From Swiss-Prot:
The gene is Ssrp1. There is a cross-link at K90, K296, K364 (Glycyl lysine isopeptide (Lys-Gly) (interchain with G-Cter in SUMO2)). Belongs to the SSRP1 family. This is FACT complex subunit SSRP1. It comes from Rattus norvegicus (Rat). Residues 534-546, 577-624 have a biased composition (Basic and acidic residues). InterPro entries: HMG_box_dom (IPR009071), HMG_box_dom_sf (IPR036910), PH-like_dom_sf (IPR011993), RTT106/SPT16-like_middle_dom (IPR013719), RTT106/SSRP1_HistChap/FACT (IPR050454), SSRP1-like_PH1 (IPR048993), SSRP1/POB3 (IPR000969), SSRP1/POB3_N (IPR035417). Residues 470-496 have a biased composition (Acidic residues). The modification Phosphotyrosine is found at Y441, Y452. One of its GO terms (molecular function) is histone binding. SUPFAM superfamilies: HMG-box (SSF47095), PH domain-like (SSF50729). Residues 458-709 are annotated as: Disordered. Component of the FACT complex, a general chromatin factor that acts to reorganize nucleosomes. The FACT complex is involved in multiple processes that require DNA as a template such as mRNA elongation, DNA replication and DNA repair. During transcription elongation the FACT complex acts as a histone chaperone that both destabilizes and restores nucleosomal structure.
Amino acid sequence: MAETLEFNDIFQEVKGSMNDGRLRLSRQGIIFKNSKTGKVDNIQAGELTEGIWRRVALGHGLKLLTKNGHVYKYDGFRESEFEKLSDFFKTHYRLELMEKDLCVKGWNWGTVKFGGQLLSFDIGDQPVFEIPLSNVSQCTTGKNEVTLEFHQNDDAEVSLMEVRFYVPPTQEDGVDPVEAFAQNVLSKADVIQATGDAICIFRELQCLTPRGRYDIRIYPTFLHLHGKTFDYKIPYTTVLRLFLLPHKDQRQMFFVISLDPPIKQGQTRYHFLILLFSKDEDISLTLNMNEEEVEKRFEGRLTKNMSGSLYEMVSRVMKALVNRKITVPGNFQGHSGAQCITCSYKASSGLLYPLERGFIYVHKPPVHIRFDEISFVNFARGTTTTRSFDFEIETKQGTQYTFSSIEREEYGKLFDFVNAKKLNIKNRGLKEGINPGYDDYADSDEDQHDAYLERMKEEGKIREENANDSSDDSGEETDESFNPGEEEEDVAEEFDSNASASSSSNEGDSDREEKKRKQLKRAKMAKDRKSRKKSSEGKKGKDPNAPKRPMSAYMLWLNASREKIKSDHPGISITDLSKKAGEIWKGMSKEKKEEWDRKAEDARREYEKAMKEYEGGRGDSSKRDKSKKKKKVKAKLEKKSTPSRGSSSKSSSRQLSDSFKSKEFVSSDESSSGENKSKKKRRRSEDSDEEELASTPPSSEDSASGSDE
């Protein structure tokens, strides 16, 4: 027989909400840990009095009763697990795990039985439903009625608000069945009534959340916060954890009370009650109980008369009444010697405390993250201009918390702490490459060389120089944005001619070198622009006279049916119209679609016929264009063979016109294709006289005639 049994995905009903967790049975007892809150139910083996197995909504359930009247119910078991649990109970707890079915007759009359902290409504020997009396918040009586109201759980999608019982009168004298019923409920119910005197009162305590100053009255079963505007009554059963945290300035203390369910102020929910104390403030406290009652109730944890620091008195009383341990920071110590780290969360600055089993951030908004719910952490490096880093935590549920603006000096301490707690570090490979002193990270400020930043600065300078050069030399450059008949080779020829013209000028050696450097830059930029334009011109250069592609059957039908769809659905958007048309097309019968398929086939045949005619006419024109291009290239090669006379003619033509154009450039424009002639006919007729005067002086004509020979 196994010493322990463990079950995952077991559910516990808490005021209408099903919370999942893990159940572990051992020789010593039964432990259930809530996955959401981390709360642990620990049932000692000697306290168990009864175990019941029954069918419930989530499969099968286990109901446990203890000697002090507490009832624990866990659901989510499989039917096959009964034998294993039954044998375990017999062997280790010496209890018989009984099977008991619920009544499903649907009757609304029966017998009410009170057992421990449970109200059971039975029909015969079978229970119909059970009500934990600790969930009752109010009990009121009428003539023959008793009404129970319940505490609400914000996590429950559907909540039970109240139950009303009709109690018939009896013939017994002196016994009121309605009052007897109500007293049985109130004796075990969690009804918050400020009856009697408080055990003690703390006056005008500073509260950070909810903000204000409150008088705290300590009652046996609940805590009463009384402020100028709001009152809060907090049952001790809703307190999950207590934290006592020293402030970074070493002069103040935080006392944090974790609550589930939270207290509410309008639509705002407070999961944490945070009190702020000064270490220098002392108090003398006298409990409103005699010494015998104090000794019997608190067993030496409290005395009738106590004195000391205010924060010590509050924490000591709360620990005794709530019966929870107080969590304090562990052995973590930051760069400044404090047990916390200054950082920012969301829009507010606060303090992050690394604890032995989690992290807690105070104070706005307070956050508590347990180690067992952390998936991984990440050290996010800050920018090069800051001296800080970010600490990111992602939970197993996918929630991410980012604590930013942490001083870089805290990096080493925090990294060592996370490593010691064996938390998964997302960027571990990067961090293990850092030396133990973390000097490389610590020196990552604005003085460090950033190669990417330097490269961006250099590129910006080059762009600025090019912009200045283009504005200074605008008289020497031609319009590069309009060269429709020009190839990439023509760009190089144009700049070569400019280079020769500048070299023949009467400038110094340094000016010539500077001019060549600028011209090479411009040539490179022009080539880049040409390469970018080339891809776009491929799309823009589509012949408008070419036949259009045929439409598909769906598009033909859509164009014909568009107006009808609009009239059937007035105000429909384009997107919705397309979706609606797609739905109609899918729902059409095959016979109706065949009509549009035939139309699409006819359109395809017409397109193929038109394309053949178009390709035939285009082939003849392309042959003529190729022959003209060959003549153009031949003329350029011949011109290169006689550069001396050409250069002198260029220098003389430059004095006449700011924009230089050689004769072969003019002639190449004149010998362009028939398509370009029709577009540029009007422009050439206006500029022909100016080009003859400015671009072809007598010396240029002589050189051209010499090359033709």
